[in-house]
């Protein structure tokens, strides 16, 4: 009753003709207010004074609350009270793809594959390079060992040949000092004999190159050669100087000339089989 009196012009609006929130609110409101207002004026009734009732205050409060509720319904003409929460929904939908991208990680898997591929190739190349160096090093060691053995064998054989060919001359030249001391002879080849004035020579036989004189512990043919008296010293010197014309030097000068000449006259074939056995 009071609603019709107070809101007679507003109550005539139909909900399908009311303006929706956010769509041409001004135009639809003017058209609706002019076309659908009530044509009859408000009726006035005569009433008598009434005694105030305690429930009238409660009724008035309820009326005010109802009016406020109706105004709230007018703001939401489509009866969709969740439209205001649409922004929050879009915000949540934008966050979901971001989380999905972190879980999938397609780019990280591809990058890991590219990183592992060159690492395998590098390890392979390193192994091949180390293998080549190892082979060259082993060959170098083998050739070096063979060269050392070859040089050692050549040096040993050269020493054996030198001892076998020129041993007689060198030993005789080294032993032919001015003191003219007799030395030990080689077994079965060279024999040291005692010559005049303590001079010794090396010969193949006991009396070879002896010039007809006696060897050690032999019979003295000419006793005058061993006479060391003062009056015959000059004669022995003359006899020694002129008696042997075969190039033998005097006992008092050029003592090392004859041993060097005899060293050159030594035979070349001095038991080569012995030197070869030592080389092996």
Curated annotation (Swiss-Prot):
Region (Disordered): 110-137, 151-177, 219-280
Keyword Transcription: no
Sequence ranges of Basic and acidic residues compositional bias: 110-122, 167-177, 223-261, 269-280
Keyword NAD: no
Spans through the membrane: none
Domain of life where this protein originates: Bacteria
Keywords: Plasmid
UniProt name for this protein: Uncharacterized 31.6 kDa protein in TAR-I ttuC' 3'region
């Amino acid at each position: 009753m009071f609603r019709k009196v107070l809101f007679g012009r507003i109550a005539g609006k139909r909900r399908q003709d009311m303006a929706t929130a956010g769509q041409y609110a001004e135009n639809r409101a003017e058209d609706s207010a002019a076309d659908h207002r009530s044509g009859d004026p408000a009726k006035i009734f005569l009433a008598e004074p009434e005694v105030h009732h305690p429930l009238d205050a409660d009724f008035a409060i309820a009326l005010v609350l109802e009016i406020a509720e109706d105004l709230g319904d007018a703001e939401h003409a489509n009866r969709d009270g969740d439209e205001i929460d649409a922004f929050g929904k879009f915000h949540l939908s934008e966050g979901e793809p971001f989380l999905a991208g972190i879980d999938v990680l397609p780019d990280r898997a591809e990058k890991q594959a590219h990183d592992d591929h060159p690492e395998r190739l590098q390890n392979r190349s390193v192994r091949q390079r180390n293998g080549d160096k190892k082979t060259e090093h082993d060959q170098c060691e083998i050739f070096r060992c063979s060269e050392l053995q070859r040089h050692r064998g050549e040096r040993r054989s050269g020493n054996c040949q030198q001892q076998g060919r020129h041993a007689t001359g060198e030993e005789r030249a080294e032993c032919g000092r001015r003191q003219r001391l007799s030395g030990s002879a080689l077994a079965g080849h060279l024999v040291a004999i005692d010559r005049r004035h303590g001079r010794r020579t090396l010969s193949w036989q006991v009396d070879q190159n002896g010039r007809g004189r006696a060897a050690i512990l032999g019979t003295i043919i000419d006793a005058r050669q061993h006479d060391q008296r003062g009056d015959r010293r000059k004669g022995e010197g003359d006899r020694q100087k002129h008696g042997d014309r075969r190039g033998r030097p005097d006992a008092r000068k050029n003592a090392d000339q004859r041993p060097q000449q005899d060293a050159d006259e030594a035979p070349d074939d001095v038991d080569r089989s012995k030197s070869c056995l030592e080389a092996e």
